[in-house]
């Protein structure tokens, strides 16, 4: 199917520059990016890459020996995909009952139901590079945590 881009209401924009993707929040506009390349290029602890009305994508970089931090989102589901590195993910129904523990590696997909306590600890020798999808959004548009 052919689409007449001259009628498209947004200016075309490429997030890529000579040194890889430019990382900022591109939501809520239509957007396409190589997510693996963007996740690996990210050095921020957390940066919102796309924030919409019902969905948000963030990139994270977890240094060796560090973690995301024990947290729980009462009203949203979360998906995490590890693009580089390794660690241990822990989940449970209470802060003091993280009964689910699994080793995770590059390529691992983690599904976190709403109301589940969770943490991800980097046990490897390189930073964990990942992307996370929240539904609905968890962080304000444009969030950057160094």
Model-flagged regions — what are they?
Residues 68-70, 89-90, 112, 118-128:
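Short beta-strand His + acidic residue motifs that chelate non-heme Fe in jelly-roll/DSBH
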């Amino acid at each position: 199917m052919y689409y007449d881009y001259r009628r498209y209401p947004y200016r075309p924009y490429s997030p890529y520059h000579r040194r890889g993707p430019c990382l900022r929040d591109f939501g809520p506009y239509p957007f396409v990016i190589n997510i693996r390349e963007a996740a690996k290029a990210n050095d921020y602890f957390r940066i919102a890459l796309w924030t919409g009305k019902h969905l948000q994508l963030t990139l994270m970089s977890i240094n060796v020996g560090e973690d995301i931090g024990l947290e729980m989102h009462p009203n949203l589901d979360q998906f995490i995909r590890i693009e580089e590195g390794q660690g241990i993910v822990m989940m449970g129904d209470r802060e003091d009952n993280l009964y689910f523990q699994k080793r995770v590696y590059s390529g691992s997909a983690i599904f976190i139901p709403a109301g589940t306590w969770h943490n991800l600890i980097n046990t490897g020798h390189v930073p964990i590079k990942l992307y996370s999808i929240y539904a609905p959004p968890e962080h304000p548009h444009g969030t950057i945590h160094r």
